[in-house]
Amino acid sequence: MGIFSEISRIEGPEFRAEVDEIIWLLTHGSQLIPVKSEVITYLYDASFIEKRRFTSFVGGYARMDSIVQEVNRCDPSDKDTCDHALILIQTSKDHPLTMSELQMLNEVTRDLPPEAVIHWGVGINDDLKDKVFLMIVYSK
């Protein structure tokens, strides 16, 4: 399908280190729309965290089409019980996100509970070239 995806449920002794990594990724680097670390420190008190990372590859699908299809294909069972979602999307400067691609992110959040709080971050990563990186962190 032209997607690299990684899915991990974070728990146990590596929990704090994983949360530190998530917060660092969302608050550092070249962020067009940064997420403030104090806004997402609730992650340290979460009863569960599920992290999903997707990177599109050039192929027969448009880059966001393929990501949305993959997100929907491997929907987490905890998505409907989460009360927070963090979403980070990155592209390169030479291949920025278009408005039509941004609108497709509605597909990623449509099944969240209506009271879920969503924090967004948009960043630049020139190593991506014409690909898109999407990270979603569901928590409660």
Regions found by a protein language model. Name each.
Residues M1-K140:
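Tubulin/FtsZ superfamily GTPase core signature
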